[in-house]
């Protein structure tokens, strides 16, 4: 693997706002794969899973119409479109709200990969909300690729977080309005366990080895569902190491900086590792230590120019974190500039009070930067800027997973290098699948 050292100018808005910080960053070659030359898959959050059959499963989203499911065969480098959810659910062309988003981490059980959906800004805006058929649980047959809808999550609210208790054969879903739902796989029905948060729910929940379910909510708080007691508890004495609390009085706040953004259970250490939404701080959550557990801060994983500076300048954490069991390192992909989700949010307010949202072609570029944390030594390493071998750039990632050989796969926004994609409404970026091999020489 060839590594090139370049100079990258990264604006850092700290006390000396007039100065730029020049940092030497390495360019790290990665592979870039296109999902489709015909579909317009626009967005992605969390939904990447590498199954035991050595295939990558990805759920994409839109803010207009349909969510899609793809399968990528690592052995043959073949991409296959498995399903359009609006076609699968017979929603397309009916003038109703549609299942246009997949926001959850997927799980595998008995030859199937499970996920769930929801609707946000999908379908005609001025319609009767009662026409919506609801959000669903789904499973993918790993042998055939068939995607099958199962029971409904609810008649209206879908999921933004998902975790599985394989022993009890239950899937947990955190819905848009903060209710925790559980799906009984064998019985094929859903149960509402009650509200754990408001609309500003965290994107990821996790289960520990005992089947307890955990989630976070602002400001730096944690809830726990105990399946033995069948109760939801707020952990009273445990706090996340947050540095920023929201000042917004909006409801919902749409902030999420004061909770974890991404978290993953590690079966080796029997702890969870997560990233704080605002500071990009990596932390360890030992659920078995003490009456409620213990939180240990480890390292700030944002791009190097922001470390130790103004905490309000740190770009929002991404969902692109994975634990690599081959080298026992955490791989995380923050962005070099911008804010929430692919640098598509503008925080500039004009004289009229309206948000100024420049065209994508005129925005300053953001880049994906790879950072690792060695769980054996506690050493953080700045690997470098991810640059696909096709000459494009990786702009912002929102999900990552590791295969059995230790290669790191990720999904997000890539600069469009394919001529067939450059007609995409003037947008310079599109969804893609990327791969980084840390063991390639």
Spans of model-derived segments:
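Surface-exposed loop and turn segments in beta-propeller and other repeat-based domains
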Residues: 32-37, 83-98, 151-157, 197-198, ...
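Repeated scaffold domains used in trafficking and secretory/extracellular systems
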Residues: 42-47, 90-105, 156-164, 199-209, ...
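Residue-level detector of Asp-centered blade-edge/turn motifs that repeat once per structural unit
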Residues: 50-53, 108-110, 165-168, 207-210, ...
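Residue-level signature of beta-propeller blades and closely related beta-rich strand-turn architectures
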Residues: 62-63, 119-121, 176-177, 218-219, ...
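Short, conserved, GDST-rich strand-edge loop motifs in beta-rich repeat architectures
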Residues: 115-132, 333-365, 413-430
């Amino acid at each position: 693997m060839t590594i090139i050292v370049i100079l990258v100018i990264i604006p850092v808005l700290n006390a000396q706002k007039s100065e730029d910080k020049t940092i030497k960053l390495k360019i790290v070659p990665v592979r870039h794969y296109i999902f489709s030359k015909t579909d317009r898959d626009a967005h992605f959050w969390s939904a990447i899973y590498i199954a035991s059959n050595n295939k990558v499963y990805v759920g994409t989203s839109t803010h207009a119409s349909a969510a899609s499911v793809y399968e990528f065969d690592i052995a043959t480098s073949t991409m296959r479109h498995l399903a359009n959810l609006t076609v699968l659910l017979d929603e397309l062309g009916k003038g109703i709200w549609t299942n246009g988003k997949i926001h959850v981490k997927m799980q595998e059980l008995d030859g199937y990969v499970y996920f769930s959906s929801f609707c946000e800004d999908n379908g005609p805006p001025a319609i009767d909300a009662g026409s919506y058929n609801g959000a669903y649980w789904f499973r993918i047959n790993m042998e055939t690729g068939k995607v099958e809808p199962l029971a409904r999550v609810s008649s209206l609210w879908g999921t933004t977080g998902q975790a599985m208790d394989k022993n009890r054969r239950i899937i947990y879903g955190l819905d848009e309005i903060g209710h925790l739902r559980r799906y009984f796989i064998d019985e094929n029905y859903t149960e509402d366990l009650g509200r754990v948060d408001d609309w500003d729910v965290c994107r990821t929940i996790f289960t520990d080895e005992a089947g307890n379910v955990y989630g976070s909510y602002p400001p730096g708080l944690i809830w726990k569902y105990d399946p033995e007691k069948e109760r939801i508890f707020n952990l009273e004495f445990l706090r996340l190491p947050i540095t920023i609390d929201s000042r917004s009085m909006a409801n919902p706040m749409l902030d999420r900086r004061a909770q974890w953004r991404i978290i993953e259970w590690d079966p080796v250490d029997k702890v969870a590792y997560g990233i704080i939404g605002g500071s990009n701080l990596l932390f360890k959550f030992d659920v078995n230590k003490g009456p409620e557990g213990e939180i240990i801060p480890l390292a700030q994983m944002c791009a190097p120019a922001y470390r130790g500076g103004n905490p309000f300048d740190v770009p929002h954490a991404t969902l692109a974190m994975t634990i690599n069991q081959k080298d026992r390192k955490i791989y995380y992909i923050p962005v070099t500039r911008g804010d929430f989700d692919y640098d598509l949010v503008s925080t500039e307010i004009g004289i009229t009070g309206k948000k100024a949202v420049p065209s994508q072609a005129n925005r300053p570029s953001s880049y994906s930067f790879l950072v690792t944390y060695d769980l054996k030594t506690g050493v953080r390493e700045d690997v470098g800027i991810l640059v696909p071998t096709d000459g494009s750039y990786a702009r912002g990632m929102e999900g990552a997973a590791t295969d059995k050989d230790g290669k790191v796969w990720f999904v997000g926004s890539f600069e469009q290098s394919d001529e067939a994609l450059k007609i995409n409404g003037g947008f310079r970026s599109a969804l893609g699948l990327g791969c980084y091999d840390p063991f390639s020489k």
